[in-house]
Amino acid sequence: MGGYEDIEGFHYGQEITFAADGRPALGYVSHTWWADEPRDGREPGSPLATETGFWRVQPGEDGGSVVEVTLAHPFGIAEIYVGTVTGTRVDLDHNVLIRTATARDVTRSVRLYGIVEGGDLAYAIDMEAEGKPLQSHLSARLHRVTD
């Protein structure tokens, strides 16, 4: 489910791919598409967003793990998140956010990922943008599909 203070709630579909190639980071690609009735010029299946990047897990000072996530978006934003891994939960907060002159005025994003009952991946993304306070923006529960 998606939405924001100035965006009517909407449903979307998503595919996330994590890929390992032997280096100390997982490649990451996410594609989302409109999954609601036609609205605001959007039709079911029309693309919404893509993000691509890498996830690196490093040993933490307290025996836990630190995760560093770099993401790039085609709408003019690049992000670096730093967070912690606790069991099957990953908490991420912005470390750096870079915007082009024409990108939306996003100033902060916080993400929570976790493996939930049945082995699904659930997440929530909160966003601070356009002068509005940090608030819920996206959340989903994804089922694992293997080739």
Swiss-Prot record:
Catalytic reaction(s) noted: peroxynitrite = nitrate
E.C. no: 5.99.-.-
Positions that bind heme b: H137
Record text on cofactor binding: Binds 1 heme b group per subunit, that coordinates a highly solvent-exposed Fe(III) atom.
Taxonomic superkingdom: Bacteria
Gene Ontology MF terms in the entry: isomerase activity; metal ion binding
Cofactors demanded by this protein: heme b
EC supergroup of this enzyme: isomerase
UniProt xrefs under InterPro entries: Calycin (IPR012674), Nitrobindin (IPR045165), THAP4-like_heme-bd (IPR014878)
One Pfam family cited in the UniProt record for this chain: THAP4_heme-bd
Presence of keyword Metal-binding: yes
Keywords tagged on the record: Heme, Iron, Isomerase, Metal-binding
Pathway: Nitrogen metabolism
Record's function text: Heme-binding protein able to scavenge peroxynitrite and to protect free L-tyrosine against peroxynitrite-mediated nitration, by acting as a peroxynitrite isomerase that converts peroxynitrite to nitrate. Therefore, this protein likely plays a role in peroxynitrite sensing and in the detoxification of reactive nitrogen and oxygen species (RNS and ROS, respectively). Is able to bind nitric oxide (NO) in vitro, but may act as a sensor of peroxynitrite levels in vivo.
Domain notes: Forms a 10-stranded antiparallel beta-barrel structure able to accommodate a hydrophobic ligand in its interior. In fact, this fold hosts the heme group, which is located in a wide surface cleft.
Family listed: Belongs to the nitrobindin family.
PANTHER family (alphabetical): PEROXYNITRITE ISOMERASE THAP4 (PTHR15854:SF4), THAP4 PROTEIN (PTHR15854)
Subunit (UniProt): Homodimer.
Name assigned to this protein: Peroxynitrite isomerase
Source organism: Frankia alni (strain DSM 45986 / CECT 9034 / ACN14a)
Lineage of origin: Bacteria, Bacillati, Actinomycetota, Actinomycetes, Frankiales
